[in-house]
Design a protein with these regions (language model features):
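Short beta-strand->loop micro-motif that forms the acidic, two-metal-ion catalytic signature
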Residues: 40-47
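Short edge beta-strands and adjacent turn/loop segments
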Residues: 28-40
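Catalytic core of pol beta-like nucleotidyltransferases
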Residues: 1-24, 33-34, 48-106
Length: 106
């Protein structure tokens, strides 16, 4: 990842953790694999201690927008509770496989 992408991720993480200090964030997808093109988005798994609701999703989406706006990077947060991620059907999904194989914790 580029220095700009790394700084965007740091800014995003700091913003999310202001409200959700226990949040775990993992980059996955083409930018994590290193095969992104300039138009690729930045996929980020966000795992929270609590069940996300509409306000949670709106807040995290706003954090993503704010972090990526100036440098022109589109962040795409995918949000789950820790319980959903570790024990729900997503545990065996293609998304979970991709995160396990290529994910970069931030």
């Amino acid at each position: 990842m580029t220095k700009t992408e790394q700084q965007v991720l740091i800014n995003f993480k700091q913003s999310v953790r202001k409200r959700y200090p226990g949040a775990n964030l993992t980059v996955f997808g083409s930018r994590a694999r290193g095969d992104a093109d300039p138009e690729s988005d930045l996929d980020i798994l966000v795992v929270l201690d609590t069940q996300p609701n509409k306000q949670t999703e709106e807040y995290i989406s706003q954090c993503a927008w704010d972090a990526g706006f100036e440098p022109g990077i589109v962040l795409v947060p995918v949000i789950y509770s820790k319980t959903e991620w570790e024990n729900g059907p997503e545990k065996h999904s293609l998304l979970a496989t991709a995160v396990r194989e290529e994910g970069i914790p931030i």
